């Protein structure tokens, strides 16, 4: 079976590169250095216009944990409504309770809204912060999600490979388990081999130098670890390489 790649794209431009490299679908977000947050309406609109492969929109209103206030929950619903209007094929969600369990009532409402519009739903890496991942697996399946994005409860998917393999076995085809987190052309073959996953998630990004001629290097506008003159973007070449390496040892 061919291994497919979902690219975590931090902009419409990255989504275009993902498609050019052969990705099967895109998870569109912003602020990857914070783990990803909901992309702007403009990013969604332009990506939808320019990219033909399925567009999955991350619904995460802020960085940090996945315990949301009432206002934050209303923001998530409003963003979902816009995704429906924009013609996006899918959304990526995840809300937890304070005790580390899945917030089933809120997630159920989001899934109902999405499914009514014919959307595919992925439960994102909030799953990795659950107190009991196997109970969370059953909860997410019962809610009607189509896919779980997970690093196996570790920082990277390769570190969590054994847990991912257990989750895939436990899921038994009831839901797609998609490894993500630090996936690259250098570890994807091992990840596929160890887990048995058939779909992989990666940003496949590179750092691109700004085209600015004048550069004021005496000021940092954003976070201290960001360089205003370096930009992260998905690389079509890296997308191709990851797909090739993922499938290199697969039977014809």
Can you say where each PLM-predicted feature lies in the sequence?
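Active-site mouth loops of central-metabolism enzymes
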Residues: 1-11, 59-77, 96, 121-133
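Active-site-adjacent beta->alpha loops and helix N-cap segments on the catalytic face
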Residues: 13, 32-56, 71-74, 95-115, ...
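Catalytic cores of alpha/beta
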Residues: 13-20, 67-79, 128-143, 167-169, ...
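Glycine-rich phosphate-binding active-site loops on the catalytic face of alpha/beta enzymes
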Residues: 25-37, 82, 86-98, 145-158, ...
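Histidine/lysine/aspartate-rich catalytic loop segments that bind and position anionic ligands
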Residues: 118-158
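C-terminal alpha-helical cap/extension of soluble enzyme domains
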Residues: 171-252
């Amino acid at each position: 079976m061919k291994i497919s790649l979902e690219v975590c794209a931090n902009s419409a431009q990255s989504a275009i590169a993902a498609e050019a490299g052969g990705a099967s679908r895109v998870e569109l977000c912003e602020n990857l250095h914070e783990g990803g947050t909901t992309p702007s309406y403009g990013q969604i609109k332009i990506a939808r216009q320019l990219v033909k492969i399925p567009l999955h929109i991350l619904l995460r209103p802020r960085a940090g944990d996945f315990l949301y206030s009432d206002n934050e929950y209303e923001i998530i619903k409003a963003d979902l409504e816009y995704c429906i209007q924009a013609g996006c094929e899918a959304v990526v969600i995840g809300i937890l309770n304070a005790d580390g369990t899945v917030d089933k009532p809120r997630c159920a409402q989001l899934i109902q809204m999405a499914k009514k519009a014919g959307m595919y739903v992925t439960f994102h890496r909030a799953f990795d912060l659950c107190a009991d991942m196997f109970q969370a697996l059953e909860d997410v399946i019962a809610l009607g999600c189509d896919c779980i994005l997970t690093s196996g409860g570790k920082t990277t998917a390769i570190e969590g490979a054994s847990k991912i393999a257990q989750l895939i076995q436990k899921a038994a085809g009831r839901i797609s388990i998609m490894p993500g987190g630090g996936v690259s052309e250098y570890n994807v073959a091992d990840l596929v081999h160890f887990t048995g996953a058939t779909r992989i998630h990666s940003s496949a990004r590179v750092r691109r130098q700004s085209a600015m001629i004048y550069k004021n290097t005496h000021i940092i506008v954003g976070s201290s670890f960001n360089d205003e003159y370096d930009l992260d973007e998905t690389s079509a070449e890296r997308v191709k390489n990851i797909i090739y390496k993922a499938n290199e040892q697969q039977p014809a």
